[in-house]
C-alpha cells in the first residue's frame, strides 16, 4: 500500500476574492460527485468480497470509513447551506 501526501483531497471550497454564484454551485456539484465516487468505490470493494475475490479486509474497512466520513461531511455542508438560506429568507427587505 502506497502512502501519499495529505494534499490529495480536492480543494473544493477555497476562499476566492471574487466569488460568483455559479462557482459556488459548481464547487458543490464537484463535492457531491467526489462523495459519490467514494461511495461507489466502497460499494465495489464490498461486492468484490461477496463475489469471492481476494480483497484485504483493511482496504474494505478504510474505504467504507472514507465513504462514511465524506457522506457525513456532505450532510453537514447541506445543513449549513439550508440554515444560511433560511436566515436569508427571514431577513426583512
UniProtKB/Swiss-Prot annotation:
GO terms for biological process: bacterial-type flagellum assembly; bacterial-type flagellum-dependent cell motility. Keywords: Bacterial flagellum. Pfam families: FliE (PF02049). It is found in: Bacterial flagellum basal body. GO terms for cellular component: bacterial-type flagellum basal body. NCBIfam families: fliE. Belongs to the FliE family. PANTHER family: FLAGELLAR HOOK-BASAL BODY COMPLEX PROTEIN FLIE, PTHR34653. This is Flagellar hook-basal body complex protein FliE.
Amino acid at each position: 500500500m502506497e502512502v501519499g501526501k495529505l494534499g490529495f483531497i480536492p480543494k473544493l471550497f477555497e476562499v476566492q476574492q471574487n466569488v460568483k454564484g455559479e462557482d459556488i454551485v459548481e464547487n458543490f456539484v464537484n463535492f457531491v460527485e467526489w462523495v459519490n465516487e467514494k461511495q461507489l468505490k466502497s460499494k465495489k470493494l464490498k461486492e468484490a468480497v461477496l463475489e469471492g475475490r481476494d480483497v484485504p479486509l483493511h482496504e474494505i474497512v478504510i474505504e467504507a470509513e472514507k465513504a462514511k466520513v465524506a457522506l457525513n461531511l456532505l450532510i453537514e455542508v447541506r445543513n449549513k447551506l439550508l440554515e444560511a438560506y433560511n436566515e436569508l429568507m427571514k431577513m426583512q427587505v
